[in-house]
Amino acid sequence: MASPAPPEHAEEGCPAPAAEEQAPPSPPPPQASPAERQQQEEEAQEAGAAEGAGLQVEEAAGRAAAAVTWLLGEPVLWLGCRADELLSWKRPLRSLLGFVAANLLFWFLALTPWRVYHLISVMILGRVIMQIIKDMVLSRTRGAQLWRSLSESWEVINSKPDERPRLSHCIAESWMNFSIFLQEMSLFKQQSPGKFCLLVCSVCTFFTILGSYIPGVILSYLLLLCAFLCPLFKCNDIGQKIYSKIKSVLLKLDFGIGEYINQKKRERSEADKEKSHKDDSELDFSALCPKISLTVAAKELSVSDTDVSEVSWTDNGTFNLSEGYTPQTDTSDDLDRPSEEVFSRDLSDFPSLENGMGTNDEDELSLGLPTELKRKKEQLDSGHRPSKETQSAAGLTLPLNSDQTFHLMSNLAGDVITAAVTAAIKDQLEGVQQALSQAAPIPEEDTDTEEGDDFELLDQSELDQIESELGLTQDQEAEAQQNKKSSGFLSNLLGGH
């Protein structure tokens, strides 16, 4: 029965090679480039180094745990496991209570006046008292037999053997990092001793200054905080969460500031474009339709009662009044000046009433305005000046147009000419009457004056006598009376002016 087995196995195994022969050959794997191969090799080396470091750390942790157990015993190892649980913050309430207890113990040790050996003795005494109380309670409750059985069968049972070396693992990892740091520092010392000396001196100086300003108690408390808080941040990834939130806020802030700046730039450019377009449209519109501001017009029309204002027409249809001047009106004294100048310039062609009379008086021979007329006019001007000043200071007066000015000037010129003529005639008549009254009745001189002059000025009584002697008619007397009336009317008119 043993002989047919090989053929059966051979028969059963025959189809397999046939299937393998019938199956198509698998394609060869793609060949990687040299750079990729080198990168893969480096990654494999790094992974192997990490695995080796992990194994070394685990081995060192095991050795440290064994050494601590051998030196301090199981109670110390149990305390180490409890401390590991507290520092890992697996149970937040217990970790918080341990943190508060550690702070209280630290500040008690820092502020108490007792020395270190006093504190150690107190701690040992407290431990002994606790153990005695525990024994008494257990002996009374369970009895001596139970206590003996418990003491005889006492064994250390660890339900979680994997968590025991955790604190020792951290200690071992820290020790390995410290040993690596020492090796690197020794290598740095061999390569550059000067830099190493400078670095060590700088570090020592820094810690000296820090210790002079910050007490050692504060530094120790900071170490305690780091021992409790660093595992909390590391286990819960609090630092990574805070960093991600801060990064998102910074990104939003950066984006918001950039968008705000770009928006302000766009608004400013649009405002500049609108302003330039508006300025161009306003210039075109102002060229077609000039605007007259009320404030500018009021300022131009603001005048005072000092001098004559100068009115000038501008290109846009407005007029300008020089500030501090008074425009000419019908009540202004300056309107008489050009009329008097024109009258005195053209009065030289007016025929003389004396007609060659031999008088050398400048007032009588001058054909200008008489002194009496000037005196009366000065009196009238002195009376009218306050009223004119009050009128000019009372409000603003606008200049007259060309037609009104022409009519006003013509009327004033006519009135002035009429008044001047009447005053001249009256003065001449009064002068003739005074000369006749003062002159002596000498016939020879009269005949001489009659021969030398064209006419003779006689007194009124003499005129009446001559008229009666010559036998004038009543019509001539009526004409003489009309002349008297006209002269009286002219004198009254002159007195009114």
From Swiss-Prot:
Q: Which residues lie on this side of the membrane: Cytoplasmic?
A: 1-59, 117-118, 230-497
Q: Say where the protein is mainly found.
A: Golgi
A single GO BP annotation from the record? sensory perception of pain
Tissue specificity:
Overexpressed in esophageal squamous cell carcinoma.
Q: Which CDD domains match?
A: RETR1_RHD
Known consequence of changing E456R?
Severely impaired binding to GABARAP
Q: Where is this region: Reticulon homology domain?
A: 84-233
UniProt protein name: Reticulophagy regulator 1
In which organism is this protein found?
Homo sapiens
